């Protein structure tokens, strides 16, 4: 199966999961990225079961609205039973690197409110040690050079994310992203805390302190479920 076929497989599995596990009338948490987009497409078939959705990005909000979902502001919501999102890498503990799509801060906020985080990914995303995928760090623009120096002191090689047109990439929050390569992440929780404490960092794309509760992994043999 191709990577796209595996993504579609886990997206449908996640739609089946929320149909079974999320009570009618509840609010659904929705992530960002190519796999999350396929989940939105799949879950739209029974969108009327839900009171609405909280989205982690402007892009996901647009896609949800195109399908007729009511998109709610997180400040209006007290409870999100399940948040569904992809990952750039995930390890055996359920810790993840996220933020390749630039929505790491809002993803982390919505995930922190959710009762369960369901990660959907193809088999290539499950790794023994994270760090091959560059670690995104969202940074206040005025602090980008200072943060880059401190991240380099931790052993990383930070690079400012750029748009295809050569301009500096900006998040939905108006900040910049440093993509940090060269890290072998053997202590995800410790590194998440260390980077988050650097002044000027909004958040790092390590989801270890609040990792996944369920992994739906697309493989050639079908969808494998892991509970953490």
From Swiss-Prot:
Pfam families: Rib_5-P_isom_A. Pathway: Carbohydrate degradation; pentose phosphate pathway; D-ribose 5-phosphate from D-ribulose 5-phosphate (non-oxidative stage): step 1/1. GO terms for cellular component: cytosol. GO terms for molecular function: ribose-5-phosphate isomerase activity. It comes from the Bacteria. Substrate binds at residues 32-35, 85-88, 98-101, 125. Its EC number is 5.3.1.6. The active site is at 107 (proton acceptor). The keyword Isomerase applies. It is an enzyme of class 5 (isomerase). The keyword Membrane does not apply. InterPro entries: NagB/RpiA_transferase-like, Ribose5P_isomerase_typA_subgr, Ribose5P_isomerase_type_A. Catalyzes the reversible conversion of ribose-5-phosphate to ribulose 5-phosphate. PANTHER family: RIBOSE-5-PHOSPHATE ISOMERASE. Homodimer. Belongs to the ribose 5-phosphate isomerase family. This is Ribose-5-phosphate isomerase A.
């Amino acid at each position: 199966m191709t990577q796209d076929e595996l993504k579609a497989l886990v997206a449908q599995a996640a739609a089946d999961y929320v149909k079974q596990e999320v009570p009618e009338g509840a609010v659904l948490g929705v992530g960002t990225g190519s796999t999350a987009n396929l989940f939105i497409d799949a879950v739209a078939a029974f969108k009327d079961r839900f009171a609405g959705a909280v989205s982690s990005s402007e892009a996901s909000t647009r896609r949800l609205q195109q399908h007729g979902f009511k998109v709610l502001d997180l400040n209006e919501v007290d409870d999100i039973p399940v948040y569904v999102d992809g990952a750039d890498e995930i390890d055996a503990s359920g810790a993840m690197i996220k933020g390749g799509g630039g929505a790491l801060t809002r993803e982390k906020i919505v995930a922190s409110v959710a009762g369960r985080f369901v990660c959907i990914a193809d088999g290539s995303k499950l790794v023994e040690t994270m760090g091959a995928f560059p670690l995104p760090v969202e940074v206040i623009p005025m602090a980008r050079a200072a943060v880059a120096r401190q991240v380099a002191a931790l052993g990383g090689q930070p690079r400012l994310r750029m748009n295809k047109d050569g301009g500096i990439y900006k998040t939905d929050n108006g900040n910049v992203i440093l993509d940090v390569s060269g890290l072998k992440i053997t202590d995800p929780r410790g590194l998440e805390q260390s980077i988050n404490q650097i002044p000027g960092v909004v958040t790092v794309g390590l989801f270890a302190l609040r990792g996944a509760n369920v992994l739906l992994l697309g493989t050639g043999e079908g969808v494998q479920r892991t509970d953490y």
